[in-house]
């Protein structure tokens, strides 16, 4: 995640929505794995898997195979969690308590999207279903009851607020947002709401 790996390393292991679906299907074909979910955002890459109790499984090695990476030097950027530690991590994550901006809203949506994508590709199972649903419920409760979840605690909102505090007027400024994914759309809308003239560009052209 953003605490352990710089942005270039995170980009190396990131998945698009399409690639994540294909990767989950391949991962579930691994002997002993009952279900898997890939959570890939700009700030983190996590692979969740339920598997046989007595199975020795290296999700890092599985990830490297999926990415065609043959280099163990990246392993220090990853951490493995199991059982209660893994569940607690997901609950904290869903509440925005492990985000760059404490209490930010996007991660809860990203967790729900990851679960839905796994459902579409038939790679989740009862254990991951219950775990992720409980995490989403906990995340909603935190955002409803905790003061840190109020307002607009996303990175882009904080950036625009900081510019305003420094005396920069966004009205009429020409801004370019690279990427039209979820965060790109949030960035474009936030800048537009602040009065900027916004252009959005994508890295790849896809017809149809």
Predicted regions and their residues:
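Glycine-rich phosphate/diphosphate-binding loop of Rossmann-like nucleotide-binding domains
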Residues: 164-208
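Conserved short-loop catalytic and cofactor-binding motifs
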Residues: 11, 147, 196
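Alpha-helix N-cap/helix-start and coil->helix boundary motif
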Residues: 44, 84, 108, 205-206
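A glycine-rich (often HGG/GG-containing) alpha/beta subdomain
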Residues: 1-99
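Glycine/serine-rich phosphate-binding loop and adjoining beta1-alpha1 elements at the start
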Residues: 73-170
């Amino acid at each position: 995640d953003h605490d352990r790996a710089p942005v270039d390393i995170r980009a190396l292991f990131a998945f698009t929505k399409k690639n994540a679906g294909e990767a989950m299907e391949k991962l579930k074909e691994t002997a002993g794995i009952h279900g898997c979910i890939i959570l890939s955002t700009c700030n983190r890459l996590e692979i969740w898997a339920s598997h046989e109790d007595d199975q020795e499984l290296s999700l890092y090695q599985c990830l490297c195979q999926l990415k065609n990476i043959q280099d163990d030097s990246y392993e220090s950027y990853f951490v493995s969690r199991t059982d209660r530690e893994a569940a607690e991590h997901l609950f904290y994550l869903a509440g925005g308590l492990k985000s760059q901006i404490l209490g930010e809203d996007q991660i809860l949506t990203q967790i729900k999207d990851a679960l839905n994508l796994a459902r579409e590709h038939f790679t989740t199972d009862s254990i991951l279903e219950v775990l992720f649903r409980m995490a989403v419920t906990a995340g909603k409760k935190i955002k409803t009851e905790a003061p840190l979840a109020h307002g607009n605690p996303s990175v882009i909102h904080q950036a625009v607020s900081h510019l305003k505090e420094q005396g920069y007027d966004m009205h009429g400024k020409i801004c370019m947002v690279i990427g039209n994914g979820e965060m790109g759309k949030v960035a474009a809308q936030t800048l537009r709401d602040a009065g900027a003239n916004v252009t959005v560009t994508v890295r790849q052209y896809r017809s149809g």
